[in-house]
Amino acid sequence: MAHKKGTGSTRNGRDSNAQRLGVKRYGGQTVTAGSIIVRQRGTQVHPGNNVGRGKDDTLFALIDGVVKFEHKTRSRRKVSVYPATAE
């Protein structure tokens, strides 16, 4: 039985926190200006109409409205925000 820890066990023993990425507002949901729509690494989803892109590729709404996920091409997705129609 060892009376000292091995060198590996003292250097291990940490785990990084989850990054909490993903879609935060889905298609059809209403958003206010500045609301985060997608948190991502890289551009899996591209910004469309009335959507801004942060330095960490986060997509956010530039106006109040309704979220709509669309296809730019067959392989590229984009998200847009359209003004809510008054009913």
Curated annotation (Swiss-Prot):
It comes from the Bacteria. Belongs to the bacterial ribosomal protein bL27 family. GO terms for biological process: translation. The gene is rpmA. PANTHER family: LARGE RIBOSOMAL SUBUNIT PROTEIN BL27M, RIBOSOMAL PROTEIN L27. One of its GO terms (cellular component) is cytosolic large ribosomal subunit. This is Large ribosomal subunit protein bL27. Keywords: Ribonucleoprotein, Ribosomal protein. Residues 7-19 have a biased composition (Polar residues). Residues 1-23 are annotated as: Disordered. HAMAP family: Ribosomal_bL27 (MF_00539). It holds the Pfam family Ribosomal_L27. GO terms for molecular function: structural constituent of ribosome. It comes from Synechocystis sp. (strain ATCC 27184 / PCC 6803 / Kazusa).
